[in-house]
Amino acid sequence: YFTTEPRDNLKEYFNLGMNFTNTIAINGGSENARSYFSYGNTTANGVMKNNTFSRHNLMFKQNFILFNKYLKLDFSANYINQKMENVPMSGEARNPLYSLYKVGRDVDMRYFKANYKRVAQTVDDITLGSVQYKRLLGQDIQNWPWAGENYNNPYWLAEKTYSSRSINRLILNGTANVKIIEGLNFQVRYSRDQTFDKNIDQRYATIRFKTKES
């Protein structure tokens, strides 16, 4: 995997990021009632492998003017579904840039892209922090010949770590306005904002982290 021709490992690691956005809206009504509906979605593929983003947004609005304008009703609902997968990490251990900057330009990273993992032998141990675990004979471990804290194969990080965050959000608003006499109104408002947030973080134990100091 050593080469006499200098390689641009950063350029070869990253992909072309792409982002797509689509929207559609419909509205209509009369003097006393109007309706509005819209849908929008965004999908994106990041510059790093397996990094994706998607977002869906539904919006509905309705208003009424009743009883010769003595009662006005307004209602809106907004639903948002959003999912992010494998957002690039900062720091050192799980940040592929850390290793890409450290590896020499005489290393052909295409080899480690095609061979980012290997099967553990009897001599292979895994260490997480200051704790050493039993040997993982026959299990996948990262193929990376250089030892060092936080120093990991960037292609192993892309293929063998997974994180996601899913967000479902519902926003409701309602207003009722009653005209009592000219210049005097009574108004009631309702609002609700509810969010469900789910996070997943998975990683293989052979990722090298900095040993904790006592």
Give a label for each model feature.
Residues 1-4, 47-48, 61-169, 187-214:
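Surface-exposed loop/interface segments of Gram-negative outer-membrane beta-barrel transport/assembly proteins
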